[in-house]
C-alpha cells in the first residue's frame, strides 16, 4: 500500500469538488471531500499540504484508504487557532495535477471558563454581603461582555423532604387534597428571597484569549432561618456558578446540656 502524504505521491489522487469547503467553529471545521484513486494500487491518503495566501503551509489531516481506481467520499476535520475570528478563509491544495481551492468558513464560537464555579458563603446574617473573586476567561473567537447579573437563587436543600414529611404526619388521614394543601403551604412559608448579585466589572469587553478577574458582591436575604442548609446559583452566559451558605452560629448540643 502506497502512503500519500503532503510530501509525496499526491499526484495519485484527485477530487471531484471544484472547491473543497470546510465549515464550523475554528476548533472543528468539517467538510465532505470525494477522493479518487487514479492509480492501480491501493493507497492511504494520510495528509495533504494546504497553501494559504500568507505563504504559509498547513498540513491537512485526511486518513482515508482507497482501493485501486476507487472513488470515496470522506469527512475531513481540521482545527485552527480557537481564537480565529469568524469569516471566510481561502486557501489552495495540490491534488494530482490540479490545484484546488479550499474555503474555510469559520463560525462564531462562544467558549468560556469560570474559576471557581463553586463557592462557600460563610454566614447567613440578614443582609450580609459576601465578596468573591472569579476568573472569567474568553476561550472562543468573539468579543464578550461581562454580564450584568441582578440576582441568584437560594433555597433550603431540605425544603421538599421536610415539608412533605410534616404534611404526611400531620394530616395524612384527612385525604390527599388536605395533605397537598399543607405541603404547599409549608413550601411557600420556607421559600427565601433572592440573593442580590453585583459584578464590579459588568459591561467590560473581554477579547478572545483574554481573562479578567471579576469582583462579585453577593447580598443574602434579610430573613434566613438558623441551622438550615441553604444553597443556590446564578447563571453566567451558558454556565452556572453555585454557592452554599454556612451558618456560623454554633449549634447547641442537648446531650452536652444534660451532662452539665
Residue ranges and their predicted role:
Residues 1-40, 109-143, 149, 256:
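Beta-sheet-dominated interaction scaffolds and their linkers
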Residues 2-17, 36-76, 141-212, 216:
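Surface-exposed binding patches on compact interaction domains or structured appendages
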Residues 25, 68, 85-86, 126, ...:
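Surface-exposed loops/turns
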Residues 31-36, 76, 89-95, 131-137, ...:
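Buried hydrophobic-core signal for structured, non-transmembrane domains
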Residues 37-39, 52, 80-82, 95-97, ...:
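Beta-strand elements of well-folded, non-transmembrane domains
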Residues 63-96:
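Extended, hydrophobic interaction surfaces within ordered domains
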Residues 76-85, 188-190, 216-226:
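Extracellular/luminal low-complexity segments enriched in Ser/Thr/Pro
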Residues 83-109, 222-257:
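Terminal connector regions
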Amino acid at each position: 500500500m502506497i502512503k500519500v502524504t503532503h510530501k509525496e505521491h499526491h499526484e495519485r489522487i484527485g477530487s471531484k469538488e471544484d472547491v473543497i469547503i470546510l465549515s464550523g467553529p475554528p476548533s472543528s471545521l468539517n467538510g465532505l471531500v470525494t477522493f479518487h484513486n487514479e492509480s492501480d494500487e491501493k493507497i492511504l491518503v494520510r495528509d495533504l499540504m494546504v497553501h494559504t495566501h500568507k505563504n504559509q503551509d498547513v498540513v491537512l489531516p485526511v486518513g482515508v484508504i482507497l482501493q485501486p481506481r476507487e472513488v470515496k467520499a470522506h469527512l475531513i476535520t481540521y482545527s485552527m487557532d480557537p481564537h480565529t475570528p469568524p469569516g471566510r478563509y481561502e486557501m489552495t491544495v495540490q491534488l494530482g495535477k490540479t490545484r484546488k481551492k479550499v474555503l474555510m468558513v469559520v463560525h462564531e464560537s462562544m467558549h468560556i471558563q469560570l474559576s471557581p464555579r463553586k463557592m462557600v458563603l460563610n454566614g447567613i446574617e440578614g443582609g450580609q454581603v459576601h465578596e468573591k473573586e472569579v476568573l472569567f476567561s474568553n476561550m472562543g473567537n468573539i468579543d464578550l461582555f461581562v454580564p450584568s447579573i441582578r440576582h441568584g437563587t437560594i433555597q433550603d436543600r431540605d425544603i421538599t423532604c421536610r415539608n412533605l414529611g410534616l404534611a404526611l404526619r400531620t394530616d395524612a388521614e384527612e385525604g390527599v387534597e388536605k395533605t397537598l394543601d399543607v405541603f404547599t403551604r409549608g413550601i411557600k412559608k420556607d421559600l427565601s428571597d433572592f440573593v442580590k448579585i453585583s459584578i464590579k466589572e459588568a459591561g467590560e469587553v473581554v477579547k478572545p484569549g483574554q481573562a479578567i478577574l471579576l469582583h462579585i458582591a453577593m447580598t443574602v436575604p434579610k430573613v434566613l432561618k438558623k441551622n438550615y442548609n441553604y444553597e443556590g446559583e446564578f447563571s453566567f452566559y451558558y454556565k452556572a456558578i453555585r454557592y452554599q451558605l454556612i451558618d456560623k452560629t454554633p449549634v447547641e448540643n442537648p446531650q452536652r446540656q444534660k451532662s452539665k
